[in-house]
């Protein structure tokens, strides 16, 4: 297993290098540039000022030279400074947004897993029942409902029409004047709509995966043997079928790791949540190349790490993978 992990890690390095190079080239060749955002309404900006900014940002060099200079800094975890007038380090801007995105997505993932597993198990063990039909309908609705449409619908209903919940940000304008418990309630109320929207589609997908996985497991011979021995259905499902049915779900959870850091671009933009997703959108529209590349590197690295973690985890929970790899190695 250690040799397998090392081999996959070594293969991931050139892949990460290729991802960063292609991303850098695509971003550099995109229409417009940072100067279009820095001096859009200044017709008196002299040619000398623009040339100075171009030289300062290194935009006058060929793309491969710019990429090499960026790569040398990135290896030292120095992603440069933002092209915006504040000129703040990229890691500083990302560090300010990362805890918010991580907190929201961890809550979302915990809710999805906590609800999807029992929903999927019950749907599989009661196949074609009324419960199974209702959950199947919910899954189809969840897959077909766009996040942005659901977000706007809930904002209009609960925020505008009923006035029950706030629709943007993480705290109200008068937050500093509230008592401690009022501040906690205010923060919680701001989380309700984003978390509901984020978990709706994910819950539909995970519960469907769990149902399909459980259906495949309960048809296996060892499950039928456990039933033939007279074990109760509860024991058969909980002790014999559930563990093996969770294998695909473990893989999916590992692959969801990049999303915990990358954030949801749509949800954070609609609800004005200052997270990684909103930072990515703002950086793209302002052509802030260093921040865009910093986000892409983090997401790409986590994607490769997630694939490695998924493979290792699958081998740990499924002995057939470990012993099969040993036999092939011999």
Residue ranges and their predicted role:
Residues 45-78, 223, 272-283:
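Short hydrophobic, aromatic-rich alpha-helical segments embedded in or entering the lipid bilayer
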Residues 2-3, 94, 98-131, 160, ...:
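Alpha-helical transmembrane segments of integral membrane proteins
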Residues 1-11, 118-154, 247-249:
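Cytoplasmic-entry segments and transmembrane alpha-helices of multi-pass inner-membrane transporters
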Residues 59-117:
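An internal, D/E-rich "acidic patch" concept
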Residues 22-29, 58, 72, 138-168, ...:
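Membrane-water interface segments at the C-terminal ends of transmembrane alpha-helices
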């Amino acid at each position: 297993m250690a040799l397998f992990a090392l081999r996959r890690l070594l293969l991931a390095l050139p892949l990460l290098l290729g991802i960063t190079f292609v991303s850098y080239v695509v971003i550099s060749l995109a229409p417009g540039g940072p100067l279009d955002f820095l001096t859009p309404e200044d017709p008196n900006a002299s040619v000398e000022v623009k040339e100075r900014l171009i030289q300062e940002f290194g935009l006058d060099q060929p793309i491969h030279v710019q990429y090499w200079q960026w790569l040398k800094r990135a290896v030292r975890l120095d992603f440069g400074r933002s092209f915006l007038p504040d000129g703040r380090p990229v890691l500083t801007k990302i560090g300010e947004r990362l805890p918010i995105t991580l907190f929201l997505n961890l809550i979302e993932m915990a809710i999805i897993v906590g609800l999807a597993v029992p929903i999927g198990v019950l749907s599989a063990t009661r196949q074609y029942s009324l419960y199974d039909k209702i959950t199947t309908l919910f899954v189809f609705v969840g897959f077909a409902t766009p996040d942005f449409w659901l977000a706007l619908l809930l904002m209009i209903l609960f925020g505008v029409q009923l006035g029950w919940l706030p629709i943007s940000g993480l705290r109200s304008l008068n937050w500093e004047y509230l008592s401690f418990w009022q501040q906690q309630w205010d923060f919680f109320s701001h989380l309700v709509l984003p978390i509901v929207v984020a978990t709706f589609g994910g819950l539909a997908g995970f519960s469907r995966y769990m149902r399909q996985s459980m259906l495949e497991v309960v048809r296996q011979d060892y499950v039928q043997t456990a039933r033939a021995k007279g074990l109760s259905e509860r024991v058969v499902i909980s002790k014999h079928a559930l563990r093996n049915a969770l294998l695909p779900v473990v893989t999916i959870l590992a692959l969801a790791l990049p999303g915990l850091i990358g954030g949801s671009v749509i949800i954070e933009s609609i609800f004005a949540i200052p997270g990684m997703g909103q930072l990515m959108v703002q950086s793209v529209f302002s052509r802030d190349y260093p921040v865009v590349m910093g986000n892409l590197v983090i997401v790409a690295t986590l994607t490769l790490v997630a694939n490695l973690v998924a493979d290792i985890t699958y081998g740990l929970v499924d002995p057939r993978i470990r012993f099969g790899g040993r036999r092939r190695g011999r």
